[in-house]
UniProtKB/Swiss-Prot annotation:
One of its GO terms (cellular component) is membrane. Its main location: host cell. Induction: Expressed in the late phase of the viral replicative cycle. Keywords: Host membrane, Late protein, Membrane, Transmembrane, Transmembrane helix, Virion. The keyword Heme does not apply. It is a multi-pass membrane protein. Belongs to the asfivirus C257R family. This is Transmembrane protein C257L. The keyword Transmembrane helix applies. It is found in: Host membrane; Virion. It comes from African swine fever virus (isolate Warthog/Namibia/Wart80/1980). The chain crosses the membrane at residues 123-143, 163-183.
Length: 257
């Protein structure tokens, strides 16, 4: 009984003939038809195309998806006749097929479709190579295999340059949203402080307008600043710095400054 990985490895073995017949490629000499194993790559490429059309607003979306599904079904029939098993097209996607590949150098399972694992220049020429994870082949030469194998294969679908623009837009919106909230809260806090300061100044001004101030008929209590001194701790309890007012009234330093 064949497994999906058996089918994928068969396709990789025949990949150099997938562009045949083509006189420009020396390996195609005498080959009149591409091997049926190449249907695996056709399905994988169609699945990528289907994924892109699935989330578009193009008016031709339904028509295009219908045609893609028909093409996928044709290749699925070819593979069923070849291997005698029913292969789900969803299993033949680039990021899933990667699990089946073997690192020729170490024997470990390869995580991505990188040249050092597959030697797949022929696939690239045929247009079958999937978009590598950000960093491309450079990342596979810069990082050890143990590190690379810790990267979840499924993320290849989302961590590629073609899709990354959407995540960058979302990230930018989140950053702008946070910035907006912080600025709004800061402005509101400053506005409240300014409002309280105006109330304090108004309070002082009203007290100074007493016509009997500094006379025997003064309406203020014996300590003209008593009410003001009682008001300062109230504002300090709300987090305001009242150091200047304390200094003017001869009070000891307080908190929040």
């Amino acid at each position: 009984m064949y497994s999906v990985c058996d089918v994928v490895r068969d396709a990789v073995a025949q990949s150099h003939l997938c562009a045949c017949p083509n006189d420009k490629l020396p390996q195609c000499k005498g080959v009149t038809k591409a091997p049926p194993e190449c249907s695996v790559f056709h399905v994988a490429k169609l699945q990528d195309t289907k994924f892109k059309w699935k989330y578009t607003l193009d008016p031709l979306k339904a028509q295009k998806l219908s045609q893609i599904n028909k093409d996928i079904e044709k290749d699925a029939i070819t593979l069923k006749l070849l291997y005698g098993i029913e292969l789900s097209p969803e299993d033949l996607e680039w990021w899933k097929m990667q699990r089946c590949l073997i690192n020729k150098k170490t024997g470990a399972k390869g995580g991505q479709f990188a040249n050092k694992y597959l030697e797949r220049q022929d696939l690239e020429l045929l247009g079958y190579s999937p978009t590598p994870i950000i960093g491309g082949d450079f990342m596979f030469t810069a990082l050890p295999d143990k590190v690379l194998r810790t990267i979840p294969i499924a993320w290849d679908r989302f961590l590629n340059p073609a899709m990354m623009i959407f995540f960058l837009i979302i990230l930018l919106c989140v950053i702008l949203g946070i910035f907006y909230v912080l600025v709004r809260n800061t402005l509101r806090r400053k506005q409240k402080i300014k409002q309280h300061q105006m109330e304090i100044k108004r309070f002082i001004k009203e007290k100074e307008q007493d016509p009997y101030i500094h006379t025997s008929f003064e309406s203020w209590p014996a300590d003209p600043n008593k009410e003001w001194k009682e008001l300062i701790p109230v504002y300090e309890a709300q987090g305001y710095c009242m150091a200047d007012y304390r200094k003017k009234l001869g009070m000891p330093p307080g908190p929040n400054c």
